[in-house]
Design a protein with these regions (language model features):
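Phosphopantetheine-dependent thiolation modules in NRPS/PKS and related acyl-activating systems
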Residues: 1-97, 379-384
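Conserved S/T- and glycine-rich ATP-binding loop of Class I adenylate-forming
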Residues: 63, 101-104, 135, 178, ...
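Conserved adenylation A10 loop of the ANL superfamily
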Residues: 98-110, 231-232
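AMP-binding/adenylate-forming
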Residues: 112-125, 134-188, 200
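Gly/Ser/Thr-rich phosphate-binding loop
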Residues: 190-243
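AMP-binding/adenylate-forming core of the ANL superfamily
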Residues: 252-279, 283-286, 335
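AMP-binding/adenylate-forming catalytic core of the ANL superfamily
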Residues: 275-361
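Conserved C-terminal "lid"/linker of ANL adenylate-forming enzymes
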Residues: 295, 352-384
Length: 384
């Protein structure tokens, strides 16, 4: 093989379609609710996109940022399909792709990855999932997880991609690789549909509850693989449910000082991880929890302590604590100030969070009590 590695045309088309869909939602101020957990994945279409001049500029700028093409000259002069945009992009050298961190607060941070690194990761995954006949994408390809698993991987395996949602999921078939986030898998588990043999599920973008994974396997899903990584690093390790350990991809190595649980890349550079980890052996790690105390809702980082502080600013609230619930959304426990009507206070809180917090930050359930939940040792405890 000679020359630099190149992005497959099919991958360029899928990434382009997803970036255009995301940018048009932003420009048109559409409410996408739970983002990656609820959005409709962009589909390639043969119909020209109805863009005005400002939308054309916005789409060109967004694509230029992702594909690192600095000017807007690749923007078509006439109404064009997403495939037309992709074809223009493909005529130029693409050495890196830029992806963005997810977060409900703060500005998403860009992270550039070389095409060589992205393709190396996708080829390694292709070897591990070589029996795949079709990729079913419940996530778009405008973030690193979706880009690798639903754009690069199927292009390398030369298999079709079916994009959809939980409600429009095609009938699963042997050889399917279904790519989603924990909220998708929770919804599929609730639907209770039977799984045919030889269907593999992939999950990332948040913690996959152990009970959920076990329920899906018990219902007949052949494999469920939890992916650990970040927008900064790409995939770091894979965990076969119900195991607790993540097997490192070949790019990553544990340092000899195992007690510090430090990872280095193939160049020997240490990697800053969002989680504390514990080595199980030379190639497997266990996650011990986020260092920044963030949790993920729909693949987006949110911060329960910050949200609890905001709830504490609501009139009638003495103190509050926020946790991630079993259903993948946030829940709040409230200690009222005085003895207010709890139903009225809950209504007030829902109006308050709608005005102050992003959709993914808003607790969907509220419990009330005279004091915050604690265990017999006096430490913060969960509640039902």
């Amino acid at each position: 093989m000679t020359g630099d590695p190149a992005l497959p045309p099919a991958a360029i088309r899928r990434i382009t379609t997803a970036v255009i869909a995301r940018e048009l939602r932003r420009l048109r101020d559409e409410d996408i609710g739970q983002s990656k957990a609820a959005e409709t994945v962009g589909h390639e279409t043969t119909d020209p996109l109805a863009l005005d001049s400002l939308e054309t500029m916005g789409v060109a700028t967004a694509l230029g940022a992702v594909f690192q093409q600095d000017d807007l000259s690749f923007a078509p002069d006439t109404p064009a399909t997403s495939a037309d945009w992709a074809a223009r992009i493909a005529t130029r050298p693409i050495e890196r792709l830029t992806v963005y961190t997810s977060g409900a607060t703060g500005r998403p941070q860009p992270h550039a990855h070389t095409i060589a690194d992205l393709l190396a990761e996708a080829h390694e995954l292709a070897r591990q999932f070589a029996r795949t006949r079709r990729v079913v994408a419940l996530v778009p390809a405008d973030h690193l997880y979706g880009l690798i698993w639903t754009a690069l991987l199927p292009a390398i395996l030369d298999v079709p991609v079916i994009a959809g949602t939980v409600l429009t999921l095609p009938a699963p078939a042997a050889g399917d690789l279904i790519v989603g986030v924990p909220e998708h898998w929770a919804a599929l588990a609730r639907l209770g549909k039977p799984w045919p043999a030889d269907v593999t599920g992939i999950s990332s973008g948040g913690a996959l509850p152990a009970a959920l994974g076990e329920d899906l396997i018990a219902a007949g899903l052949t494999r469920l693989v939890d992916v650990y990584g970040s927008s900064e690093t790409g995939a770091i390790g894979l965990r076969e449910v119900p195991a607790i350990g993540y097997t490192l991809l070949s790019r990553w190595q544990l340092t000899s000082a195992a007690d510090t649980a430090t990872l280095v890349d193939r160049e020997g550079q240490p990697v800053s991880l969002p989680d504390d980890i514990r080595p199980i052996d030379e190639r497997r790690i266990e996650l011990l929890g986020r260092r920044d105390h963030a949790v993920q809702v729909g693949g987006i980082n949110v911060y329960p302590d910050r949200i609890a502080a905001v709830l504490g600013e609501c009139a009638g609230v003495a103190s509050a604590v926020v946790r991630l619930g079993d259903h993948g959304r946030l829940k709040a426990f409230i200690v009222p100030a005085g003895e207010p009507d709890e139903a009225a206070l809950e209504q007030q809180l829902r109006q308050f969070v709608a005005a102050r917090l992003a959709p993914v930050e808003r607790p969907t359930s509220f419990r009330f009590g005279a004091e915050l939940p604690r265990n017999p040792m006096g430490k913060p405890a969960d509640w039902r």
